[in-house]
């Protein structure tokens, strides 16, 4: 982090740790320390990732949970996509937990609650265009699945995609600090992830 302070990089780029599942981001001890202390964005690729055959970045996806404190992720990704001349999309993940409710409540109740969450997420995403946060051409999607792994797999990735996620500030300091949701997205992402300090 000392070198980052002196060199003032725009982003730190890391590969995944050598152990773990191929095709997913594997956070080793060095990356973990950096993920909890970096004042600059960090990019980390899935284990075994070889890059795009197309020769570069083709689209940036902002993971947006729809909360006001994470709007900065969408704004920063919109600026980055414009600067790099690539399309952007915004995705909200509606994830069915392993067990959302006791069995006596019933699966139809879980389905109903998940659909209500997805409906609210679609309305929140649509508001991004109404408010001018993103352009009319930005793709907005709610992606669901049974667990984080299935949800991330269902996100219709393209070769050359980059996923951007936000973090929470620690004690008012803009540093990378992944919450549980961000950690799960990072761990299950099949594409490189850009982690933006909050």
PLM features per residue range, with description:
Residues 1-52, 154-198:
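Gly/Ser-rich helix-loop-strand patches that form or flank binding pockets
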Residues 108-123:
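A short acidic, glycine-rich active-site loop
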């Amino acid at each position: 982090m000392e070198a980052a302070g002196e060199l003032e990089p725009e982003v730190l780029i890391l590969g995944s740790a050598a152990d773990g599942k191929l095709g997913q981001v594997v956070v080793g001890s060095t990356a973990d320390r950096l993920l909890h202390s970096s004042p600059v964005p960090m990019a980390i690729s899935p284990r075994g990732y070889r890059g795009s055959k197309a020769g570069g970045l083709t689209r940036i996806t902002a993971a947006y949970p729809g909360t006001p404190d994470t709007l900065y992720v969408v704004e920063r990704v919109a600026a980055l996509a414009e600067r790099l001349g690539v399309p952007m999309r915004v995705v909200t993940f509606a994830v069915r937990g392993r067990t959302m409710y006791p069995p006596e409540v019933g699966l139809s109740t879980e389905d109903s609650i998940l659909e209500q969450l997805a409906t609210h997420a679609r309305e929140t995403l649509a508001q991004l265009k109404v408010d001018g946060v993103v352009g009319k051409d930005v793709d907005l999607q709610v992606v669901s699945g049974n667990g984080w792994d299935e949800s991330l797999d269902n996100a219709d990735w393209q070769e050359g995609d980059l996923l951007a996620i936000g973090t929470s500030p620690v004690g008012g300091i803009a540093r990378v600090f992944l919450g549980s949701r961000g950690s799960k997205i990072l761990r299950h992402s099949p594409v490189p992830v850009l982690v933006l300090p909050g």
